[in-house]
Regions:
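A short glycine-rich, Lys/Arg-flanked "PGG" loop and its adjoining helix->strand segment in the class I
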Residues: 139-151
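N-terminal auxiliary segments of SAM/dcSAM-dependent transferases
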Residues: 1-24, 34-39, 187
Length: 196
């Protein structure tokens, strides 16, 4: 039994909210619920990550730990990317599917414990990783992302300094041989590594 957002089937009592927000210049609505990450607002880290991403129409994006969908869905709506969105949390995935429909966005959304069910390669892997699931999960998102990136593709994550940004940065440098801090704001770091 778990109420945590990184559980497969959170058992928290339902508490549906509707968020009306503007992301990347697009007006969007999102259903959220108890047992999912950041249910009352689009968290600051996700908003910062979106502002720092450089993506183009038709490119492929893998959103790891997508939650109810704000990252992948807003990128698909604003830029016409092909979004693939995965999460372990079935409640979050149900919401992400409903949110895709509500916002008239096409996306591929399915359950996967990190990359377990993912196939193929992508131009971009993005993540606002589930810090509370532990450093091991964050490091696995970083380490294995390389296997799912095209050459020249990139991994971009958001992480707070106090929640391990320096160690995430050094892990990204170990894996990719490079890591750029795209932005620092209010203790949040946007980190990007390119597969060379």
């Amino acid at each position: 039994m778990s109420k945590m957002y990184y559980a497969e089937n959170p058992d928290a009592a339902h508490d549906i909210h509707e968020l009306r927000v503007e992301l990347l210049g697009e007006k969007m609505t999102f259903l959220t619920d108890a047992g999912v990450f950041s249910k009352k607002m689009i968290d600051f880290g996700s908003q910062l990550l979106l502002k720092c991403l450089e993506v183009n129409q038709g490119e492929t994006v893998l959103d790891v730990g997508c939650g109810y969908g704000p990252l992948g869905l807003s990128l698909a709506k604003a830029y016409g990317v092909q979004a693939t969105m995965v999460d372990i949390n079935n409640r979050a995935l149900d919401l992400a599917r409903q949110n895709a429909e509500r916002n008239k966005v096409e996306a591929t959304i399915f359950q996967s414990n990190i990359y377990e069910q993912v196939e193929g390669t992508f131009d971009h892997v993005i993540s606002n990783p589930p810090i509370r699931a532990g450093k091991q999960v964050v490091h696995e998102i970083i380490e294995k992302s390389k296997d799912f990136l095209e050459t020249g593709g990139d991994l971009t994550i958001v992480i707070q300094k106090k929640q391990g940004a320096p160690s995430a940065k050094s892990k990204m440098e170990d894996v990719f041989g490079n890591c750029e801090i795209l932005k620092k704001d209010k203790g949040y770091y946007i980190l990007r590594s390119v597969k060379e």
